Amino acid sequence: LIAETKNKVIEIKVEKLYEKYLEYPDLISIDVREPEEYKTVAIDRAVNFPRGMLEMKIAQHPLVNHHCEIEHSLQELSEKDIYLICGTGARSALSIQALQNIGFEKLYSVEGGMQAWIDEGYPTVSYLN
């Protein structure tokens, strides 16, 4: 199922995501891992919307939560590139499929996920006390 799903999504390498991260301060990256995973190590500015809650939380993204109507938030987000990351790339691919089902098109799954990001030595943050 995951291999089939990955064939239907656009994957981006962590090197390319890092370039975009440096170039665009308002880059939309969503970490779909569970909160415990996210708190341990994450990409700065990535928002944590776990896979199981993604469709319900997407309209609350900080870049669009100024809208009073959920439809306006979803419309604005659907016009932007959105990069989804998980542990190794599987959950982000499944998340893309879910977002495509509600009308999103400009979606990218981070190939190799956080593991690839960490392996390349790119900056991370931790939210553990």
Residue positions per predicted region:
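Rhodanese-like catalytic fold shared by cysteine-dependent sulfurtransferases
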Residues: L1-I28, P35-D81, A90-N129
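Short, surface-exposed ligand- or partner-binding patches at beta-edge/loop junctions that are enriched
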Residues: L84-I85
